[in-house]
Amino acid sequence: MKQESMKVLFFIRKSRLKKNGEAPIFLRVTINGQLDEVRIQRSVPLKLWDNVKERSKGKDRSSTELNSYIEALKVRLYQIHKELLCREALITPKNLLIKVSIR
């Protein structure tokens, strides 16, 4: 079984602010140097985003729900990655995002 290195990154793009001032959240998956990124259909106020933790800093309900969603998505990505490794299937960032139903 070949070991595939995978990294998951959640980030915002300040250059693509929505009309309400919130920044869309993106997910980038990198596997052995290949990367693909996609919007996760969630947004966050600029002042509440923590780039280091890749989470919302807020303590309100919407921030807590957003952080739970991000964590669940990350866990699901790693689960599918592990399943594909066990099956020795071709693993690309695009395939992984399709399996998670983001793309």
Question: What is the role of each PLM region?
Answer:
Residues 1-11, 28-34, 40-42:
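Nucleic acid-processing catalytic cores of prokaryotic defense/repair systems
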Residues 13-23:
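Single-stranded nucleic-acid-binding OB-fold domains
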Residues 18-20, 33-103:
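N-terminal helical hairpins
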Residues 26-29, 53:
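Long, polar/Ser/Thr-enriched low-complexity segments
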Residues 25-26, 99:
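Intrinsically disordered, low-complexity boundary segments flanking structured domains
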